[in-house]
Amino acid sequence: MAPLTDLLSCSIIEKDSNGDVLWTWSYPVILESQKAVVGRKCNLESEHNSSQVFIFSRHKHHWFYIHCSEVFDSDKLPKVKQFALVLFAKDFNPRKYEVLSRVLSKMYCKTGKPTEILQLYLSVFTKGSCSTQENGTFVSDDFNSHRFTVNTNIRELVKAFELETILIYTALLLKKRIVVYHHSLEELLKWIGLFPALMKHRKVSDNLFPWVDLVDDELAELKRHSHYVAGCRNSSISSRTDLFDLLVNIPAREITVASHAKESLTMTKTHKEIALFMVQLSENQTYTEAQIISEINDKTQDLLNQLTSLAVVQGPDGRKMVSAQTLKEKNLPFAVENFLINLAVAENLFLV
């Protein structure tokens, strides 16, 4: 079993019977900037805080996962009404850290001792697993990429947006700024977790921001990225066209292309064929989720192979690149030429 060295820290935040909130324990250390964003997300200070048990998002280059628990009279936590267990990690894997945070939270309810949490945390960090008699077992190796993929639901995404799913696919392929809106946090986190599976050849999670509040520090962090997939619960995001090229409104089942991005997201015959292909895949009940993802990836590879075949000019570093002149000589329709240029730029294959 491999050690889980992606783990960075573990913290406990408690809300007592008087409504006071306190960071009672952290290991090895947590920064003030991390405390600020976690405090905003878990919202323990509110009298009507979210009933969402497990939430996740990112802060700078790291991910955080929060498991919130109600405390009952039978638990070993007198005067504590609620607590949140917070994990910071280097990797994006909500399923893995939901299980781990649940095991740790159950142990804290039972014992009320941070030292017990520390023992389990160190076991996971050094051995990749921890085991308790009554509160469950965690094995990091159980959450490999294949099992994570199987638990996505691209079929549901395509059924929701039908032929317009191609806009999401193309925006991801061309590294555009995508904002996903849903008023429900639970639904937002569920839907936005599907997007990386559409681009199997690329690590979309590097530019994934599952839950962004429209506050200065989070927006400043978002704007440091030239492309991203960002989730938002605030409906006013629809007027912030400075933040997106494509807006996906989940409850309304609507996709909006910002006016400044319409030319680069113009659909070609190839796009329409892929759109129809994805709809047919979603309707075919004999296909598993993994097969749907694999079929879409094959279509993506066909596009990339077509692009590579046009890379005939040697760049400064010796790599074969695509030039505007090469595309001009092909006498392609404007929309196709424009798409290939944008794809070459996204794949770092365009010679300026």
Give the positions of each predicted feature.
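Acidic, Ser/Thr/Pro/Gly-enriched alpha-helical scaffold modules and adjacent low-complexity linkers
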Residues: 2-352
